[in-house]
Amino acid sequence: MSWIERILGRTSSSSSSSKSKVPEGVWTKCTSCEQVLYSEELKRNMHVCPKCNHHMRFDARTRLLSLLDQDSAQEIAAELEPQDVLKFKDLKKYKDRLTAAQKQTGEKDSFITMYGTLHNMPVVVASFNFEFMGGSMGSVVGAKFVRAAERALADNIPFICFSASGGARMQEALFSLMQMAKTSAILAKMREKGVPFISVLTDPTLGGVSASLAMLGDINIAEPKALIGFAGPRVIEQTVREKLPEGFQRAEFLLEHGAIDMIVQRKDMRDTLARLCAKMTNKPTPFKTAELIVEEA
């Protein structure tokens, strides 16, 4: 080795060792515009891209805790956990899939239910977690949904549910399909008693969830560009052998065709839900809006 190679080799090795390693997870990429984003900034922005306003998928527990007033949340039916009663096996055993999903998410199942206050108004809230087996609906989801609805009925308070699901959980076969009827039945009881149910459809809301509880709200809200439908657009195109309209099954298309009532930005969701709950329960708006301030002036 020549003297210059020795010097260059020493310099390059010392410079590479002095480079500080960037910890994993500090940066992430927008799933729409592919802009590289600082993860902490994205969290502060409620997982909405600050560059293109794309609403990314949002962790269920974080969503509910950010919706409710601080320190007001009480989890409902947290003890319920799915069981592999059918001993189901496809490429993997169902119990192994459950274990992997529980380890990945830190949750027992794909659905979280809570009681708390929203701008000091008591409410029951629930959310699907898409990261847990695609937010699929099984027996535990149905049981927790009913328990949450029963709490809303008992206290005569609004029930708000955020959907993010691929549909019924195939590993539970007919047990999962039964949850469509079970959740629809309790919502019929809520409607009969005049207890408000607000459904918020987020990306994606598909299959048995969209065909049951997700579209049965007294008011159906969607986040921008959420994919909403029964089968996905690719499956429909292959079935009907036709090209679907642009934006088909997206929230904006559904709003234009009267399938949902409104589209709300995530940053506005908390205040919008509070105003709707107040109107639907005949209570004063829990905070002053710009319109009220103008009226009082």
Curated annotation (Swiss-Prot):
Residues 1-23 are annotated as: Disordered. Residues 26-295 form the CoA carboxyltransferase N-terminal domain. Its cofactor is Zn(2+). GO terms for cellular component: acetate CoA-transferase complex. One of its GO terms (biological process) is fatty acid biosynthetic process. It is found in: Cytoplasm. Pfam families: Carboxyl_trans (PF01039), Zn_ribbon_ACC (PF17848). It is an enzyme of class 2 (transferase). Disulfide bonds: none annotated. One of its GO terms (molecular function) is carboxyl- or carbamoyltransferase activity. InterPro entries: AcCoA_carboxyl_beta, Acetyl_CoA_COase_Trfase_b_su, ClpP/crotonase-like_dom_sf, COA_CT_N, Znf-ACC. Binds 1 zinc ion per subunit. A zinc finger (C4-type) spans 30-52. Keywords: ATP-binding, Cytoplasm, Fatty acid biosynthesis, Fatty acid metabolism, Lipid biosynthesis, Lipid metabolism, Metal-binding, Nucleotide-binding, Transferase, Zinc, Zinc-finger. Its main location: cytoplasm. It comes from the Bacteria. Pathway: Lipid metabolism; malonyl-CoA biosynthesis; malonyl-CoA from acetyl-CoA: step 1/1. Zn(2+) binds at C30, C33, C49, C52. NCBIfam families: accD. This is Acetyl-coenzyme A carboxylase carboxyl transferase subunit beta. The gene is accD.
